[in-house]
A protein has these predicted regions:
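Conserved phosphate- and dinucleotide-binding cores of soluble alpha/beta proteins
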Residues: 1-23, 27-55, 59-323
Length: 323
Protein backbone atom coordinates (compact mmCIF):
# COMPACT_ATOMS: atom_id res chain seq x y z
CA UNK A 1 0.00 0.00 0.00
CA UNK A 2 2.87 2.38 0.71
CA UNK A 3 4.38 1.63 -2.71
CA UNK A 4 1.01 2.32 -4.36
CA UNK A 5 0.74 5.56 -2.38
CA UNK A 6 4.20 6.64 -3.56
CA UNK A 7 3.28 5.93 -7.19
CA UNK A 8 -0.02 7.79 -6.85
CA UNK A 9 1.60 10.90 -5.34
CA UNK A 10 4.42 11.10 -7.87
CA UNK A 11 2.67 9.74 -10.96
CA UNK A 12 -0.76 11.36 -10.56
CA UNK A 13 -1.07 13.97 -7.80
CA UNK A 14 2.24 15.63 -8.62
CA UNK A 15 2.10 15.11 -12.37
CA UNK A 16 -1.29 16.80 -12.70
CA UNK A 17 -0.95 19.35 -9.90
CA UNK A 18 -4.12 18.19 -8.16
CA UNK A 19 -5.36 20.90 -5.77
CA UNK A 20 -8.96 19.91 -4.94
CA UNK A 21 -9.77 16.28 -4.24
CA UNK A 22 -11.86 13.65 -2.53
CA UNK A 23 -10.58 10.43 -0.97
CA UNK A 24 -12.64 7.33 -0.38
CA UNK A 25 -12.32 5.53 2.95
CA UNK A 26 -9.77 2.73 3.17
CA UNK A 27 -6.21 1.67 3.86
CA UNK A 28 -4.98 2.69 0.38
CA UNK A 29 -6.07 6.31 0.73
CA UNK A 30 -4.96 6.38 4.39
CA UNK A 31 -1.48 5.40 3.22
CA UNK A 32 -1.47 8.34 0.79
CA UNK A 33 -2.60 10.73 3.53
CA UNK A 34 0.05 9.47 5.94
CA UNK A 35 3.01 9.84 3.57
CA UNK A 36 2.20 13.34 2.36
CA UNK A 37 4.27 14.91 5.21
CA UNK A 38 7.20 12.56 4.47
CA UNK A 39 7.38 11.34 0.88
CA UNK A 40 5.34 14.23 -0.51
CA UNK A 41 7.58 16.67 1.34
CA UNK A 42 10.69 15.01 -0.09
CA UNK A 43 9.32 15.68 -3.58
CA UNK A 44 8.80 19.35 -2.76
CA UNK A 45 5.06 19.14 -3.40
CA UNK A 46 3.67 20.91 -0.32
CA UNK A 47 1.62 23.89 -1.44
CA UNK A 48 1.43 22.50 -4.98
CA UNK A 49 -0.99 19.59 -4.44
CA UNK A 50 -3.73 18.41 -2.03
CA UNK A 51 -4.59 21.84 -0.64
CA UNK A 52 -8.39 21.70 -0.61
CA UNK A 53 -10.38 18.60 0.34
CA UNK A 54 -13.97 17.42 0.02
CA UNK A 55 -13.59 14.90 2.80
CA UNK A 56 -14.81 13.70 6.16
CA UNK A 57 -12.37 14.55 8.97
CA UNK A 58 -10.26 11.40 8.62
CA UNK A 59 -7.94 10.95 11.63
CA UNK A 60 -5.22 9.95 9.16
CA UNK A 61 -5.38 13.51 7.82
CA UNK A 62 -4.14 14.97 11.14
CA UNK A 63 -0.40 14.87 10.25
CA UNK A 64 -1.09 16.48 6.85
CA UNK A 65 -3.15 19.21 8.52
CA UNK A 66 -0.54 19.84 11.22
CA UNK A 67 2.27 20.14 8.66
CA UNK A 68 0.39 22.63 6.48
CA UNK A 69 -0.53 20.32 3.61
CA UNK A 70 -4.31 20.41 3.93
CA UNK A 71 -5.49 24.01 4.04
CA UNK A 72 -9.18 23.23 4.39
CA UNK A 73 -11.60 20.31 4.54
CA UNK A 74 -15.31 20.55 3.80
CA UNK A 75 -17.08 17.47 5.08
CA UNK A 76 -20.02 15.21 4.24
CA UNK A 77 -20.30 14.29 7.93
CA UNK A 78 -18.17 13.94 11.04
CA UNK A 79 -15.90 11.24 12.44
CA UNK A 80 -16.26 9.79 15.94
CA UNK A 81 -13.50 11.01 18.24
CA UNK A 82 -12.50 13.99 16.09
CA UNK A 83 -14.85 16.52 17.71
CA UNK A 84 -12.32 18.33 19.91
CA UNK A 85 -9.64 18.42 17.24
CA UNK A 86 -12.10 19.85 14.71
CA UNK A 87 -13.18 22.51 17.21
CA UNK A 88 -9.54 23.54 17.70
CA UNK A 89 -8.95 24.04 13.95
CA UNK A 90 -11.56 26.53 12.67
CA UNK A 91 -8.97 27.59 10.08
CA UNK A 92 -9.31 24.17 8.42
CA UNK A 93 -12.87 23.00 9.14
CA UNK A 94 -16.19 24.82 8.68
CA UNK A 95 -17.03 25.69 12.30
CA UNK A 96 -20.34 27.24 13.37
CA UNK A 97 -20.93 29.82 16.14
CA UNK A 98 -21.47 27.00 18.66
CA UNK A 99 -18.01 25.58 17.97
CA UNK A 100 -19.17 22.45 16.16
CA UNK A 101 -18.46 21.55 12.56
CA UNK A 102 -20.93 22.43 9.82
CA UNK A 103 -21.16 19.56 7.33
CA UNK A 104 -23.45 19.26 4.32
CA UNK A 105 -23.71 16.03 2.36
CA UNK A 106 -25.53 17.59 -0.61
CA UNK A 107 -23.03 20.46 -0.94
CA UNK A 108 -20.16 17.97 -0.78
CA UNK A 109 -21.67 15.85 -3.55
CA UNK A 110 -22.06 18.98 -5.69
CA UNK A 111 -18.47 20.00 -4.92
CA UNK A 112 -17.34 16.49 -5.86
CA UNK A 113 -19.00 16.87 -9.24
CA UNK A 114 -18.01 20.40 -10.15
CA UNK A 115 -15.12 21.55 -7.94
CA UNK A 116 -12.94 18.50 -7.30
CA UNK A 117 -10.07 17.80 -9.68
CA UNK A 118 -9.85 14.18 -8.62
CA UNK A 119 -11.50 11.26 -6.85
CA UNK A 120 -9.31 8.48 -5.46
CA UNK A 121 -10.71 5.33 -3.87
CA UNK A 122 -10.16 1.62 -3.39
CA UNK A 123 -12.21 -1.12 -4.99
CA UNK A 124 -12.69 -4.88 -4.75
CA UNK A 125 -12.87 -5.82 -8.44
CA UNK A 126 -11.96 -4.31 -11.81
CA UNK A 127 -12.88 -6.16 -14.98
CA UNK A 128 -10.88 -6.45 -18.20
CA UNK A 129 -12.60 -3.32 -19.57
CA UNK A 130 -11.99 -1.12 -16.53
CA UNK A 131 -15.41 -1.27 -14.86
CA UNK A 132 -15.14 -1.28 -11.06
CA UNK A 133 -17.32 -2.62 -8.26
CA UNK A 134 -17.21 -3.41 -4.55
CA UNK A 135 -20.14 -5.83 -4.89
CA UNK A 136 -18.67 -9.34 -5.04
CA UNK A 137 -20.01 -12.84 -4.41
CA UNK A 138 -18.13 -12.85 -1.09
CA UNK A 139 -19.03 -9.37 0.10
CA UNK A 140 -21.66 -6.92 -1.14
CA UNK A 141 -20.32 -3.58 0.09
CA UNK A 142 -22.10 -0.29 -0.49
CA UNK A 143 -20.65 2.34 -2.80
CA UNK A 144 -21.27 5.38 -0.59
CA UNK A 145 -20.69 8.51 -2.65
CA UNK A 146 -18.22 6.84 -5.03
CA UNK A 147 -20.51 6.79 -8.11
CA UNK A 148 -21.00 10.57 -7.71
CA UNK A 149 -17.42 11.34 -6.74
CA UNK A 150 -16.03 8.93 -9.34
CA UNK A 151 -17.65 10.27 -12.47
CA UNK A 152 -16.94 13.07 -14.92
CA UNK A 153 -19.57 15.82 -14.65
CA UNK A 154 -20.26 16.99 -18.20
CA UNK A 155 -21.72 20.28 -16.98
CA UNK A 156 -18.45 21.50 -15.48
CA UNK A 157 -16.95 24.66 -16.96
CA UNK A 158 -14.65 25.58 -14.04
CA UNK A 159 -11.07 25.19 -15.29
CA UNK A 160 -8.20 24.00 -13.10
CA UNK A 161 -4.75 22.83 -14.14
CA UNK A 162 -5.35 19.16 -13.31
CA UNK A 163 -8.82 18.96 -14.90
CA UNK A 164 -7.65 20.73 -18.06
CA UNK A 165 -4.46 18.68 -18.44
CA UNK A 166 -6.31 15.39 -18.05
CA UNK A 167 -8.96 16.40 -20.58
CA UNK A 168 -6.38 17.34 -23.16
CA UNK A 169 -4.71 13.94 -22.80
CA UNK A 170 -7.90 12.07 -23.77
CA UNK A 171 -6.87 10.15 -26.88
CA UNK A 172 -10.14 10.56 -28.83
CA UNK A 173 -11.00 14.09 -27.68
CA UNK A 174 -11.08 15.46 -31.26
CA UNK A 175 -13.69 12.86 -32.21
CA UNK A 176 -15.86 13.93 -29.27
CA UNK A 177 -15.64 17.75 -29.35
CA UNK A 178 -13.71 18.66 -32.50
CA UNK A 179 -11.62 21.80 -32.03
CA UNK A 180 -13.22 22.71 -28.69
CA UNK A 181 -11.11 21.97 -25.63
CA UNK A 182 -12.53 20.25 -22.59
CA UNK A 183 -11.23 19.09 -19.23
CA UNK A 184 -11.78 15.76 -17.54
CA UNK A 185 -11.97 14.82 -13.89
CA UNK A 186 -9.30 12.42 -12.70
CA UNK A 187 -11.01 9.27 -11.43
CA UNK A 188 -8.54 6.89 -9.80
CA UNK A 189 -9.07 3.37 -8.50
CA UNK A 190 -6.45 1.80 -6.24
CA UNK A 191 -6.41 -1.98 -6.05
CA UNK A 192 -4.29 -4.94 -4.96
CA UNK A 193 -3.88 -7.60 -7.65
CA UNK A 194 -4.47 -10.44 -5.17
CA UNK A 195 -6.03 -9.65 -1.79
CA UNK A 196 -4.63 -10.90 1.52
CA UNK A 197 -7.43 -13.51 1.51
CA UNK A 198 -6.44 -14.68 -1.96
CA UNK A 199 -9.22 -13.02 -3.98
CA UNK A 200 -8.17 -11.57 -7.37
CA UNK A 201 -8.69 -7.85 -7.84
CA UNK A 202 -8.67 -8.06 -11.64
CA UNK A 203 -11.30 -10.35 -13.19
CA UNK A 204 -12.55 -11.13 -16.68
CA UNK A 205 -16.14 -10.52 -15.55
CA UNK A 206 -17.39 -8.63 -12.50
CA UNK A 207 -19.30 -10.64 -9.90
CA UNK A 208 -21.79 -7.78 -10.20
CA UNK A 209 -23.06 -9.29 -13.47
CA UNK A 210 -24.10 -12.53 -11.78
CA UNK A 211 -25.44 -10.60 -8.77
CA UNK A 212 -27.76 -8.72 -11.13
CA UNK A 213 -29.13 -12.00 -12.46
CA UNK A 214 -29.46 -13.63 -9.03
CA UNK A 215 -31.20 -10.64 -7.45
CA UNK A 216 -33.34 -9.74 -10.47
CA UNK A 217 -31.86 -6.24 -10.65
CA UNK A 218 -32.39 -3.95 -13.62
CA UNK A 219 -28.73 -2.91 -13.67
CA UNK A 220 -25.42 -4.44 -12.65
CA UNK A 221 -24.16 -2.85 -9.39
CA UNK A 222 -21.17 -1.16 -11.03
CA UNK A 223 -19.54 1.47 -8.83
CA UNK A 224 -17.46 3.28 -11.48
CA UNK A 225 -17.81 2.75 -15.22
CA UNK A 226 -14.85 2.26 -17.51
CA UNK A 227 -15.42 5.45 -19.52
CA UNK A 228 -15.16 7.58 -16.36
CA UNK A 229 -12.08 5.83 -14.97
CA UNK A 230 -8.85 7.64 -15.88
CA UNK A 231 -6.24 5.80 -13.77
CA UNK A 232 -5.76 2.44 -12.07
CA UNK A 233 -3.00 2.05 -9.48
CA UNK A 234 -1.90 -1.46 -8.48
CA UNK A 235 1.30 -2.57 -6.77
CA UNK A 236 2.60 -3.33 -10.29
CA UNK A 237 2.17 0.18 -11.68
CA UNK A 238 -0.22 2.82 -13.02
CA UNK A 239 -2.45 2.53 -16.11
CA UNK A 240 -3.39 5.91 -17.63
CA UNK A 241 -6.62 4.73 -19.24
CA UNK A 242 -7.80 8.08 -20.60
CA UNK A 243 -4.74 8.13 -22.90
CA UNK A 244 -5.87 4.91 -24.62
CA UNK A 245 -7.10 5.21 -28.21
CA UNK A 246 -9.62 2.36 -28.06
CA UNK A 247 -10.92 -0.46 -25.89
CA UNK A 248 -8.25 -2.91 -27.04
CA UNK A 249 -5.47 -0.55 -25.95
CA UNK A 250 -7.29 0.06 -22.66
CA UNK A 251 -7.51 -3.70 -22.04
CA UNK A 252 -3.80 -4.09 -22.77
CA UNK A 253 -2.97 -1.31 -20.30
CA UNK A 254 -5.04 -3.03 -17.61
CA UNK A 255 -3.37 -6.39 -18.32
CA UNK A 256 0.03 -4.74 -17.87
CA UNK A 257 -0.66 -3.93 -14.20
CA UNK A 258 -2.94 -6.87 -13.32
CA UNK A 259 -0.20 -9.18 -12.01
CA UNK A 260 -0.86 -12.89 -11.55
CA UNK A 261 -4.61 -12.71 -12.16
CA UNK A 262 -6.66 -14.13 -15.02
CA UNK A 263 -6.51 -10.69 -16.63
CA UNK A 264 -2.78 -10.24 -16.01
CA UNK A 265 -1.96 -13.65 -17.48
CA UNK A 266 -3.07 -12.31 -20.88
CA UNK A 267 -0.44 -9.55 -20.84
CA UNK A 268 1.68 -9.17 -23.97
CA UNK A 269 5.16 -8.05 -22.79
CA UNK A 270 5.92 -6.39 -26.13
CA UNK A 271 2.67 -4.42 -25.97
CA UNK A 272 3.38 -3.44 -22.36
CA UNK A 273 6.79 -2.11 -23.41
CA UNK A 274 5.12 -0.03 -26.15
CA UNK A 275 2.57 1.32 -23.67
CA UNK A 276 5.37 2.25 -21.27
CA UNK A 277 7.15 4.16 -24.05
CA UNK A 278 3.86 5.97 -24.82
CA UNK A 279 3.39 6.89 -21.14
CA UNK A 280 0.13 4.92 -20.94
CA UNK A 281 1.60 2.48 -18.41
CA UNK A 282 4.16 3.46 -15.79
CA UNK A 283 5.95 1.07 -13.46
CA UNK A 284 7.77 2.28 -10.30
CA UNK A 285 11.08 2.38 -12.18
CA UNK A 286 9.49 4.57 -14.88
CA UNK A 287 8.58 7.02 -12.12
CA UNK A 288 12.03 6.90 -10.56
CA UNK A 289 10.74 5.07 -7.48
CA UNK A 290 12.93 2.52 -5.72
CA UNK A 291 10.60 -0.24 -4.48
CA UNK A 292 12.89 -0.95 -1.52
CA UNK A 293 12.16 2.50 -0.08
CA UNK A 294 8.44 1.71 0.34
CA UNK A 295 8.56 0.97 4.06
CA UNK A 296 6.54 1.87 7.16
CA UNK A 297 9.23 4.41 7.98
CA UNK A 298 7.50 6.74 5.52
CA UNK A 299 4.28 6.80 7.57
CA UNK A 300 3.96 10.06 9.50
CA UNK A 301 1.97 8.10 12.10
CA UNK A 302 2.53 4.38 12.56
CA UNK A 303 -0.25 3.69 15.08
CA UNK A 304 -3.25 5.29 16.77
CA UNK A 305 -1.15 6.77 19.59
CA UNK A 306 0.94 8.63 17.01
CA UNK A 307 -2.26 10.18 15.62
CA UNK A 308 -3.31 11.24 19.13
CA UNK A 309 0.13 12.78 19.67
CA UNK A 310 -0.03 14.63 16.34
CA UNK A 311 -3.40 16.08 17.42
CA UNK A 312 -1.97 17.40 20.68
CA UNK A 313 -4.09 14.91 22.60
CA UNK A 314 -7.35 16.17 21.06
CA UNK A 315 -8.18 13.11 18.96
CA UNK A 316 -10.11 10.58 21.06
CA UNK A 317 -10.11 7.26 19.15
CA UNK A 318 -13.11 4.94 19.62
CA UNK A 319 -12.38 2.11 22.07
CA UNK A 320 -12.25 -0.54 19.34
CA UNK A 321 -9.27 1.23 17.75
CA UNK A 322 -7.24 1.47 20.95
CA UNK A 323 -4.57 -0.98 22.05
Amino acid sequence: RILKAMMAIKGIYGEYGVQVLNHGVGFDTSAIELILPTYGESLGLRGKICRHWVLNPHPTMIPAIETGWAENLYSFGSEVGMEEYIKARPDVFAIGPDGTMRSNRAFCQAAGHYAADMFVGSTMQIDRYGNSSTATKNNVAGFGGAPNMGCDAKGRRHVTEAWFKCGNEVANRAELTGECLRGKKLVVQVITTISEKGFPGFVQELDAIQLKKNAGLDLEPVMIYSDDLTHIVSEIGIAYLHKCCNMEERMNAIRAIAGKTEVGMLEDPAETLRLRKEGIVKLPEDLGIDRSTATRELLAAKNMKDLVDWSGGLYNPPAKFRN
